[in-house]
Amino acid sequence: MKKIPQISDAELEVMKVIWKHSSINTNEVIKELSKTSTWSPKTIQTMLLRLIKKGALNHHKEGRVFVYTPNIDESDYIEVKSHSFLNRFYNGTLNSMVLNFLENDQLSGEEINELYQILEEHKNRKKE
């Protein structure tokens, strides 16, 4: 797994668009982000440049536009950020996080049943 750079929340929104398309040009990134944000094209281009400098994106020129591809996998990013979150707030244990949600009534009965099912399926796969 590659080293994961620090990515701001805004930059993460840009990365999500690029992960979704895997290869996308500047105009398409701007068009996609204009659906969900009020950022100007210049702001989006600045974020793209920052992500390149951080090593999160690769780019090359095709004709008159730049094409961007992710340099880090979305699954790797999520894994690192998930572990960071657990370490930061729950001393690295998933049990503590789930217990916190249970104790604060933040999980419905349906969600608890779904978690139970997931755990059972995972347990059965481990046995095989």
Swiss-Prot record:
Residues at the site labelled Cleavage: 100-101
Annotated InterPro entries: BlaI_family, WH-like_DNA-bd_sf, WH_DNA-bd_sf
Assigned keywords, A-Z: Antibiotic resistance, Cytoplasm, DNA-binding, Repressor, Transcription, Transcription regulation
Subcellular location(s) of the protein: Cytoplasm
Main localization (coarse): cytoplasm
GO biological process: negative regulation of DNA-templated transcription; response to antibiotic
PTM note: Upon exposure to beta-lactams, proteolytic cleavage at a single site may impair dimerization and abolish repressor activity.
Important for dimerization: region residues: 73-128
Keyword Nucleotide-binding: no
Top-rank lineage group of the source organism: Bacteria
Known DNA-binding region: 6-70
Function: Transcriptional repressor that constitutively blocks expression of beta-lactamase. Regulates genes involved in antibiotic resistance. Binds DNA as a dimer.
Family that this chain belongs to: Belongs to the BlaI transcriptional regulatory family.
Subunit structure and binding partners: Homodimer.
Protein name: Penicillinase repressor
